[in-house]
Every structure is written in structure tokens, then in C-alpha cells.
Amino acid sequence: MELVDMRDLGSRAVMRWGSSPHARTNLSRLLLSLLLLEMIVMPFEKEIRDTILAYCMRDLPNDIWYENSFDFVKDSSLKARLISEFKNARFMYKIFEGLAAEDELLLAEVKMQMLMYASIFEATIHYVLFDQYYKSTPIVQNLLTQKVHKPFSIPTGQLSAINKLLFHDGKTIIPYFETLQKRDITKVRFDEKCIAAFQLGILTGIPEQNDSTADILPDIKQIAGMPPFCAELIRIYEVRNAIHLHAELKKEIDYHLALSKIAYRRMQPFLNQIRTKLNADGLL
């Protein structure tokens, strides 16, 4: 029986990727087989690597586009990380698109996309609010304080007498007062950050969602006075770690795949709105 060189077979299939539906259909299985083989032997041959890279890179923006998209981020380390995350999200999408991902691969695609985009949204909003531009505003400062209840300090002699008066239904009523204390910045939730960004005029509605036929997530929780765009960002962040292994059920995968596509489509309006607000406030 003649042995088939999987690397040669993969190379020939990859060269036909864009023109043959049959090669495209079987490419996922071929590349997975190649991956197992090459993990034992060596990396993909240069011809295969170059073809895959060319496919993944051909529709992606150049470096200048990414630099301009995050030009408001003055922290060079954070900026590099955000750009890298965005590039990786798009590159991985192209990989899975080329594989015509299904089942486990599709679930992997969705989980990676959601995690990456949610991380970009969160890190960017946090930076704009707390690190660079609006940290001194009352709206942001309110996020860093919280109301707490503290019991009154009552002398022991008086406390015993008071306890007799403050005993009801088998329980002791503890007198306390309400005060403000500093809140740990790590405890500020993403939805609170989005609401603050909306109140500051950083995040607004997007025109395409004014149409009754607009592509809006069906299960977002509308917040009074806030546009669907903000609610979508909150929903995207909520589900980033909620895609469980049982999500291979088709309707779950379809939902999260749609969500990951919306996450990508919302990234540009998100960045544009931040830049517009910063320009309007004379901060850029």
C-alpha cells in the first residue's frame, strides 16, 4: 500500500483553497492531520506557512490603521497590547474562517473572539475613565466611593440599656450610621464603567441602530435612557466567560457566533466615539 505524504497533500489542498469547494471542505481535516504530524516532526513547510499567512493577512488592515485607531492611548505599553489583541482577534478569525470551522473548532473560535474583544473594550474604557482623561470628574470619582453602614460606638454601660430597648422579634437591632469610604478600583464593574462613559458623553448611540431592522442583540438588557449600543457592550462583556463546554449545542454556538460578529462590528464605532469626545473636549 502506497503511503501518502500528508504534508504534500496539505500543500496541494492549500494551493486550491480559494478555488475549489472540495478542497475548502476538507481543508480543516487535512490541517488538523498536518498539525498532529508536524508537532512530532517539524513546523509546516514554508510553502504551506506562506499560503496560510497570505490568506489570513490579505484582508487585514495595515499597521498604520491600528496605530490611528488607538492614537488616544498615550500609554505605549497598553497601546501595543491593545493593538496586538485586536490583530490577534482578526488573525484568528481568518484562520477559523479558512478552516470552515464547525463543532469544536467553531466553539474555540467563538470563545477566543469573545475573550479578546471584551478585553479590548474593558481595558480601553478603564484607561479613558481612570488613567488618562476623566479620572477627576465627579462621575468617575463617584465610582471610587461607596456608601457603607458603620455601627455607632456606644459605651458598654449605655449599650446594655439600649440593647433592651432595641431587642425585637428575637433579634438585636444594631444602631448604625451611613458614611462614604474609598472603593477598590478593581471592584468597579464593567457595566458601571459603560454607564459612566455614557453619562460623560463618551459613548452614544450609533446611527445604524436607529433603523427598526437594525442588527441588535435580541436579549440585551436595555438601561433607561441608554442606547442599545451601550447595552450590547455590557452583554458582550457578561458572556466572555459564560461560554461553557455544553455550548456546542447548535443554538448556543449560533448565538455566540452572532455575538462575536457584533463585537467586531462595534469596535470601530466604539473607538471613533471615544476619539470624537476627546477631540470635542480638547483632550487630543
Predicted regions and their residues:
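Short, hydrophobic, well-ordered secondary-structure elements
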Residues: 107-133
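Short, positively charged low-complexity motifs
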Residues: 2, 15-18
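N-terminal, intrinsically disordered charge-dense segments
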Residues: 28-34
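Short non-catalytic regulatory patches outside canonical folded cores
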Residues: 125-221, 246
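Charged alpha-helical initiation segments
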Residues: 40-111
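Charge-enriched, short contiguous segments at helix-coil
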Residues: 198-284
